[in-house]
């Protein structure tokens, strides 16, 4: 079958808006910057995901790892809210999943996190969110790359409450 230039142009003209909409849906949409925190929404697999994140203000114990690559993230997904994670910027050691290898302190509150690859996840997400709302900073301590030494990352919590409220408004809890 041979395509005429007119037919080819018509097909492109008809499909271009569909491609543009699909490309726009794949891009994150910023809900706002709230002091040290940013709130964003993203369509993923036909579902809306909202997350708030802050980058580490200080990182110690891992040479050549910029603090800006280390993030504390709270995510709302249709299948789970208040998912709290730290992206370390390196893979945790393989045996780091026994117990709570990463400890996060917020004021007087201690929170245990388990690890998988380059992330650490809160064991008690609700307690973590409550601590973040009431704290000034969160400090995570855990094993360094290849289990050598200890890494420490400090995240500012200024603006967390507003960023959390923004993602909660944009991705409200499902009614049961």
Language-model region placement:
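Short, low-complexity disordered leader/linker segments with a strong preference
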Residues: 1-2, 20-23
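Bacterial N-terminal signal peptides that target proteins for export
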Residues: 1-9
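Bacterial N-terminal signal peptides
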Residues: 8-17
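A generic "folded-domain core" signal
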Residues: 22-176
């Amino acid at each position: 079958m041979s395509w005429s230039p007119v037919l080819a142009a018509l097909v492109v003209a008809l499909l271009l808006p569909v491609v543009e909409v699909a490309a726009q849906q794949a891009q994150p949409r910023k809900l706002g910057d709230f002091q040290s925190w940013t709130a964003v929404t993203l369509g993923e697999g036909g579902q809306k995901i909202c997350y708030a994140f802050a980058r580490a203000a200080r990182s110690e114990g891992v040479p050549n790892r910029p603090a800006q690559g280390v993030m504390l993230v709270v995510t709302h997904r249709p299948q789970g809210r208040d998912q709290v994670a730290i992206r370390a910027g390196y893979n945790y050691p393989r045996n780091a999943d026994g117990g709570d290898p990463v400890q996060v302190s917020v004021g007087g509150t201690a929170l245990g996190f388990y690890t998988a690859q380059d992330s650490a996840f809160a064991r008690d997400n609700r307690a973590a969110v409550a601590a973040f709302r009431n704290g000034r900073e969160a400090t995570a301590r855990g094993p360094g790359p290849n289990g050598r030494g200890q890494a420490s990352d400090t995240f500012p919590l200024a603006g967390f409450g507003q960023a959390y409220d923004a993602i909660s408004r944009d991705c409200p809890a499902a009614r049961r």
